[in-house]
Amino acid sequence: MALAHPRVKAGLAISGIYDLEPIRHSYLNAKLGLDANASERNSPLQQVAGPDKPLSLVVGSAELPLLRKQTSDFAAHRAVLGLPVTYEEIAGADHFSIMDEMASPQGRITTLIRQLFERTVV
Protein backbone atom coordinates (compact mmCIF):
# COMPACT_ATOMS: atom_id res chain seq x y z
CA MET A 1 0.00 0.00 0.00
CA ALA A 2 1.11 3.55 -0.66
CA LEU A 3 0.51 4.27 3.03
CA ALA A 4 3.89 2.67 3.74
CA HIS A 5 5.74 5.28 1.66
CA PRO A 6 7.76 7.61 3.93
CA ARG A 7 6.29 10.77 2.39
CA VAL A 8 2.69 9.63 2.91
CA LYS A 9 1.34 10.83 6.26
CA ALA A 10 -2.18 9.35 6.22
CA GLY A 11 -4.62 7.58 3.94
CA LEU A 12 -8.23 7.29 2.95
CA ALA A 13 -9.55 4.15 1.26
CA ILE A 14 -12.95 4.10 -0.42
CA SER A 15 -14.90 0.88 -1.04
CA GLY A 16 -11.83 -1.31 -1.20
CA ILE A 17 -10.98 -4.98 -1.48
CA TYR A 18 -8.57 -5.87 1.31
CA ASP A 19 -8.44 -9.65 0.88
CA LEU A 20 -7.79 -10.80 -2.69
CA GLU A 21 -8.41 -14.49 -2.01
CA PRO A 22 -12.11 -14.38 -3.03
CA ILE A 23 -11.07 -12.58 -6.24
CA ARG A 24 -8.51 -15.29 -6.95
CA HIS A 25 -11.37 -17.81 -7.06
CA SER A 26 -13.60 -15.69 -9.28
CA TYR A 27 -13.84 -15.09 -13.02
CA LEU A 28 -11.74 -11.93 -12.54
CA ASN A 29 -8.64 -13.99 -11.93
CA ALA A 30 -8.54 -15.03 -15.59
CA LYS A 31 -7.28 -11.49 -16.26
CA LEU A 32 -5.43 -10.89 -12.97
CA GLY A 33 -3.53 -14.17 -12.82
CA LEU A 34 -3.20 -14.20 -9.03
CA ASP A 35 -1.67 -17.23 -7.39
CA ALA A 36 -1.95 -17.96 -3.66
CA ASN A 37 1.32 -16.17 -2.86
CA ALA A 38 0.41 -13.01 -4.79
CA SER A 39 -3.04 -12.99 -3.23
CA GLU A 40 -1.62 -13.17 0.30
CA ARG A 41 1.24 -10.73 -0.35
CA ASN A 42 -1.10 -8.07 -1.78
CA SER A 43 -3.96 -8.46 0.71
CA PRO A 44 -3.75 -5.97 3.59
CA LEU A 45 -6.06 -8.21 5.63
CA GLN A 46 -3.44 -10.96 5.51
CA GLN A 47 -0.60 -8.81 6.85
CA VAL A 48 0.60 -9.13 10.46
CA ALA A 49 1.79 -5.51 10.57
CA GLY A 50 1.15 -2.27 8.76
CA PRO A 51 2.11 1.38 8.61
CA ASP A 52 1.50 3.23 11.88
CA LYS A 53 -0.27 6.08 10.09
CA PRO A 54 -3.90 7.20 10.25
CA LEU A 55 -6.16 5.42 7.77
CA SER A 56 -9.82 6.28 7.22
CA LEU A 57 -11.88 3.52 5.63
CA VAL A 58 -15.22 4.40 4.06
CA VAL A 59 -17.79 2.32 2.24
CA GLY A 60 -21.35 2.94 1.12
CA SER A 61 -24.20 1.26 2.96
CA ALA A 62 -25.63 0.27 -0.46
CA GLU A 63 -22.36 -1.33 -1.63
CA LEU A 64 -22.00 -5.02 -2.37
CA PRO A 65 -21.94 -7.06 0.85
CA LEU A 66 -18.36 -8.21 0.11
CA LEU A 67 -17.10 -4.61 -0.02
CA ARG A 68 -18.87 -3.67 3.22
CA LYS A 69 -17.62 -6.78 5.01
CA GLN A 70 -14.02 -6.44 3.83
CA THR A 71 -13.93 -2.76 4.79
CA SER A 72 -15.31 -3.51 8.24
CA ASP A 73 -12.96 -6.49 8.64
CA PHE A 74 -9.94 -4.42 7.62
CA ALA A 75 -10.83 -1.70 10.12
CA ALA A 76 -11.09 -4.34 12.86
CA HIS A 77 -7.81 -5.92 11.72
CA ARG A 78 -5.94 -2.60 11.96
CA ALA A 79 -7.48 -1.93 15.37
CA VAL A 80 -6.30 -5.32 16.67
CA LEU A 81 -2.80 -4.48 15.41
CA GLY A 82 -2.96 -1.18 17.30
CA LEU A 83 -2.83 0.87 14.10
CA PRO A 84 -4.78 4.14 13.78
CA VAL A 85 -7.99 3.57 11.84
CA THR A 86 -11.49 4.95 11.45
CA TYR A 87 -14.39 3.22 9.72
CA GLU A 88 -17.53 4.79 8.34
CA GLU A 89 -20.44 3.68 6.19
CA ILE A 90 -21.92 6.43 4.04
CA ALA A 91 -25.71 6.06 4.25
CA GLY A 92 -27.35 5.11 0.96
CA ALA A 93 -24.14 5.35 -1.07
CA ASP A 94 -23.12 2.73 -3.61
CA HIS A 95 -19.89 2.18 -5.53
CA PHE A 96 -20.58 5.15 -7.81
CA SER A 97 -22.59 7.62 -5.73
CA ILE A 98 -20.10 7.46 -2.86
CA MET A 99 -17.78 9.65 -4.94
CA ASP A 100 -20.33 12.48 -4.65
CA GLU A 101 -19.19 12.69 -1.02
CA MET A 102 -15.74 13.63 -2.26
CA ALA A 103 -16.82 15.88 -5.14
CA SER A 104 -18.80 18.17 -2.86
CA PRO A 105 -16.87 20.64 -0.66
CA GLN A 106 -19.26 19.73 2.18
CA GLY A 107 -19.26 15.99 1.43
CA ARG A 108 -18.44 13.51 4.15
CA ILE A 109 -15.35 12.16 2.37
CA THR A 110 -14.10 15.70 1.73
CA THR A 111 -14.51 16.35 5.46
CA LEU A 112 -12.57 13.19 6.33
CA ILE A 113 -9.74 14.21 3.99
CA ARG A 114 -9.63 17.64 5.58
CA GLN A 115 -9.53 16.08 9.07
CA LEU A 116 -6.70 13.73 8.09
CA PHE A 117 -4.76 16.64 6.64
CA GLU A 118 -5.25 18.74 9.78
CA ARG A 119 -4.11 15.86 12.03
CA THR A 120 -0.96 15.08 10.09
CA VAL A 121 0.41 18.42 8.91
CA VAL A 122 3.38 19.45 11.01
At which residue positions do the language-model features occur?
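Primarily recognizes the serine-hydrolase "nucleophile elbow" in alpha/beta-hydrolase
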Residues: 1-31, 39-40
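A general structural signal for stabilizing positions within well-ordered secondary structure
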Residues: 2-3, 46-47, 79
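Loop/turn elements at helix/coil->beta-strand transitions in domains of secreted/extracellular proteins
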Residues: 7-10, 53-54, 83
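Acidic catalytic loop of the alpha/beta-hydrolase fold
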Residues: 20, 62-66
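Residues at alpha-helix caps and immediate loop-helix transition turns in enzyme cores, especially N-
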Residues: 24, 67-70
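Active-site nucleophile elbow and catalytic-triad environment of alpha/beta-hydrolase enzymes
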Residues: 32-48, 53
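Short beta-strand/loop motif that positions the catalytic acidic residue
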Residues: 51, 57-60
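C-terminal catalytic histidine-bearing segment of alpha/beta-hydrolase fold enzymes
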Residues: 58, 69-75, 79-122
